[in-house]
Amino acid sequence: MNDSQYHQLIDDLLINLEEMLDDVEADIDYESASSILTLIFVNGSKIIINKQPPLHQLWVATKFNGHHFNYQDGLWIDERTGVEFWQFMNDAASKQAEVPVSFPRPTE
């Protein structure tokens, strides 16, 4: 993947996630600036999602841990746990929102 493809993939992912946030039942606020998306939960906790261009990775920081995702076979996969990004976000957001949260993986 070249730099242009990488940036387009991340930009699309962030836009998809922003659009989904408007439809979730949990009260999750968000801020978006300079390719950083911050999800803000009622309890004050945050999930921060950002690009890591030199490594072509997507980084996610939760109140529990940091995660680095690599693009493999059309999916963003956590390099440590092997979990796919959207499944990870469902689990992480549900924990931090303290209610079930579901982000369906977008279709291409």
Swiss-Prot record:
InterPro entries given in the database record: CyaY (IPR047584), Frataxin/CyaY (IPR002908), Frataxin/CyaY_sf (IPR036524), Frataxin_CS (IPR020895)
Superkingdom of the source species: Bacteria
Keyword annotations: Iron, Metal-binding
Keyword Repressor: no
GO BP: any one term: iron-sulfur cluster assembly
Keyword hit for Hydrolase: no
Its job: Involved in iron-sulfur (Fe-S) cluster assembly. May act as a regulator of Fe-S biogenesis.
Protein name, as recorded: Iron-sulfur cluster assembly protein CyaY
Organism: Pseudoalteromonas atlantica (strain T6c / ATCC BAA-1087)
Gene: cyaY
